[in-house]
Amino acid sequence: MTTDKPYRIQTPSGYRKYLCSGLYMPSVTTVLSATETEKAKAGLRNWQKNNPGALEAASTRGSAIHLGCENYLRGLDPGVSEEYQDFWNGITPYLDWFDTLHWSERPLRPDWNHLRSDDREVAYVWSTEHLYAGCPDLIGEIGGVKIMADFKTSNAPYSAVFPEKGDRLGFGGFRKYQKCAQQMAAYRLALAERTGYKCDVALIIVSTPETSQGIFIDTDQLDRFEAKFLKRAQQFHEMESAKDTESSSQ
């Protein structure tokens, strides 16, 4: 177990990188975004073109809900503005399920303080074996079951079931679920590598203007999503290595 403090670095391209244990590594979300299919990347670019400002608005909304969850879990006023109340309503019952909290954006137990950055208000988990890093939203227990949770806001529900042909909304929800599940599986593995604590279950808490969802992912499913993510992490590092080789030859 290392005691080196992790740091986050924003690259000129907008990708997040971390310096952890003396190694530079990408964020989990960077790996997932960079290894999307060309069709998926083109679809995102087209959506952004047709919905100017929507991506930034979604990011601001997500940050507000994340902060509300963090405040609520600490017994503080959530402080969620009226603008986002439709997304906030319905989330707290899922947060109330937890009877033990180990992490809310950063460690709540002293033996994990080596995961904090120097400013101590942020913390990360990382894998020196697979070279990636990131920040889980919530880690705790419900009746002794070790659970990692992630907060998501969306204009439409997530779906763990592959949709019927032609169901574009359902397909979007399925893709979001798949991406989030891989993200959480990656965090779970990195947390275990850094602390020895391995979550049994993951929970995606999704809030939309009309409803909220709590989607559980069991151990077997997490193991499968972990394998998928590790393939993408390997692909990412191969892509970066090829770029470095090309640059050095010019």
Positions of PLM-derived features:
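Compositionally biased non-globular segments, especially hydrophobic aliphatic-rich helices
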Residues: 33, 37, 236, 245-248
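Mg2+/Mn2+-dependent nuclease catalytic core
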Residues: 106-241
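Glycine- and charge-rich intrinsically disordered segments
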Residues: 1, 241-250
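Metal-dependent nuclease catalytic cores that hydrolyze phosphodiester bonds in DNA/RNA
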Residues: 1-133
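Amphipathic alpha-helical interaction segments
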Residues: 74, 80, 96, 195-196, ...
